[in-house]
Amino acid sequence: MKLLAHLIYLLNEQGVGNTFYLSPIIKKILDNHYEQERKAKLSTMKIYIRKFTNNGYLEKEPGHYILLKPIPTDLTTTILRTWK
């Protein structure tokens, strides 16, 4: 667990803009998080509605992604729980 937490920390510190492998489990957690975030933002915008497409990563090739922004800290616990 400590190793995985350290890897997530390193990914956030040095991974932004670099290509990395994203496991299907972690990808699903991130997708769910950003979808909920998108829905919350859309529901609060009554007049000006913008399309939110940024999931925090961009697929470069199958299974490999470019991290566009750090993984949210509240997701670290969720990710660690899936690896128990």
Language model features by range: what are they?
Residues 1-17:
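Positively charged, polyanion-binding regions of nucleic-acid-associated proteins
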Residues 63-70:
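Minor-groove-contacting beta-hairpin "wing" of winged helix-turn-helix DNA-binding domains
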Residues 53-63:
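A short, conserved structural fragment
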Residues 15-36:
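Short acidic, hydrophobic short linear motifs in intrinsically disordered regions
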Residues 71-84:
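Short, amphipathic alpha-helical interaction segments positioned at domain boundaries
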Residues 20-21, 40, 44, 60:
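Alpha-helix N-cap and coil->helix boundary residues
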Residues 37-54:
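Short amphipathic alpha-helical interaction segments
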Residues 6, 25-29, 48, 78:
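Charge-rich, solvent-exposed alpha-helical interaction surfaces
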